[in-house]
C-alpha cells in the first residue's frame, strides 16, 4: 500500500464499489469491488467475455454502471477524464488517416488539458523514428505504439491500456514495456488488460483475475501462482502405464509424451510416493510451482466448475 509523507495511506486512484453492468438480463460485470493505489502497476486478467473491457469502459466514463459506484481520484470518472488526469489506449476506434504520426500527436496534444511537448511524447512512446510516416501506412505494431503515444501525450496520473501489445512482435513488445517502465518511474499508476500472461508476470506488481464479471483473485504474481495450490511434476519413465498414472492421488492433470511425464498435483509428495511405492523408478525428476498461465487457468476453471454445479442444482 502506498504511503504519504506522514505515513498515512494515500487515497485510492480508482475504486469500484459493488459495480454491476447488465445487458438485458445478462450481467457483464457482477458485483465488482477493487481499488488501485498510486504508483501501482496492475494487470487485469480474464478470459474472453470476462468483463475486462466493459469494466475499463465504465472506468473511463464511456459506459455507466447499472448499479454500484466508481470513483477516480475521489470523484466521478467523467471529471478526471475531462481534466486530463487519465490517458487511455483502447482496442476499439481507428486513427485518423492521411496524416503523419507527428501531425496526429500534435493535433491530439493540442486538445489535452495538461499537454506534454510533442517531442517528449514521440520519444517516450518510441515513435520518433517513424514520426514523419503516414499513419495509414504503418504496421500493426507501429499503429499500437501510436495509440500509446496518444495515451501519454499529457501529464496524466493514471494510464489505462486494453490489450496494448496486440499486433506487436516480440522486439516491439520489449521496447513497449521499456517505455512503460519510464512512465511508472515517473510516478504514474498503470492498469492494463492483456492476454500475454508472461507480460503480467514480468511487468505487474499486482494482478486482478476476473471471470464472468466477478473478481476471483487479487494479489502479487507470486500470490496468484500460490493460489492455484498445485505443483508441476516432470520426469522420465520407462514403460509408461497411463491407467496407473491416472489413478494417482492428488492428480489434477496428466500429460504423457513418449517417456516424458508431466503431472499437475495438489500434493506433490503424495503423488511421487505413490509412484515410487508402486515400484516405478522415475528419472530426471523436477518439481516446480505452476506458472502464471497454469495458475490463471486453474483459478478460472475452478470458478467455471463451481458455477456449473450451482446452475445444475438450481435447474
Predicted regions and their residues:
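Helix-to-loop junction immediately C-terminal to a conserved catalytic motif
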Residues: 60
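Conserved ABC transporter NBD signature motif
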Residues: 68-82
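Conserved ABC ATPase "signature" region
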Residues: 106, 110, 116-131
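Catalytic Walker B motif of ABC-type/P-loop ATPase nucleotide-binding domains
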Residues: 159-163, 168
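Helix N-cap at the start of a conserved alpha-helix in ABC-type nucleotide-binding domains
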Residues: 170-172, 195
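ABC transporter nucleotide-binding domain
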Residues: 178-266
